[in-house]
A protein has these predicted regions:
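Short, structured motif recognition centered on aromatic/hydrophobic residues
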Residues: 6, 13, 23, 47, ...
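Vicinal oxygen chelate
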Residues: 2, 45-46, 55, 82, ...
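Conserved active-site tyrosine of GNAT-family acetyltransferases
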Residues: 19-24, 94
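A cross-kingdom feature marking solvent-exposed beta-strand/loop segments within repeated
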Residues: 5-7, 29-41, 60-78, 93, ...
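C-terminal "cap" of GNAT-fold acetyltransferases
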Residues: 37-53
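N-terminal beta-strand motif that seeds the catalytic metal site of vicinal oxygen chelate
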Residues: 1-20, 75-84, 132-139
Length: 139
């Protein structure tokens, strides 16, 4: 099976600190990992709620994909991250099934992972991130 589980649900936010505080108060969420991803122009906080992970993501520059998403659609659901054993194989399978890739090849992601994004136009309106854990990466 190419997709093994949901890795995370990503929420685009304007104010990362306010979002972290809200999820902590409302759901008892704890920050599990925090990172600035310069290449994507974002700062993210991976919070754990029960057995699930929510990636709160804020723009660090106005030209980042998160800034553009918030400008166009407002804050809210950004993408679903699916865990895969092999990012390249999963990307190839999705393209063969008719998906439109944003990333033509897997690339480094946060937490030491390897990732590739699939455009919403080819996946029924949902931005998809394929997430491959590597040795030393993961939650």
């Amino acid at each position: 099976m190419l997709l093994t589980e949901i890795d995370h649900i990503a929420i685009a936010v304007k104010d990362l600190e306010a979002a972290i505080a809200y999820y902590a108060e409302a759901f008892g969420a704890e920050v599990h990992h925090r990172e600035i991803v310069e290449s994507d122009g974002v700062e993210e906080a991976l919070v754990k709620v029960a057995d699930s992970y929510i990636q709160l993501t804020a723009a660090t520059r106005p030209d980042s994909p998160i800034a553009k998403s918030i400008e166009k659609r407002g804050e809210g659901l950004h993408h679903v991250g699916y865990r895969v054993d092999n990012c390249q194989e999963a990307l190839d399978a999705m393209i063969a099934a008719g998906a439109t890739p944003i990333d033509k090849a897997p690339r480094p992601g946060s937490r030491g992972t390897t990732v590739a994004f699939i455009h919403p136009k080819g996946s029924f309106g949902t931005l998809i991130e394929l997430v491959q854990e590597n040795p030393g990466s993961g939650h």
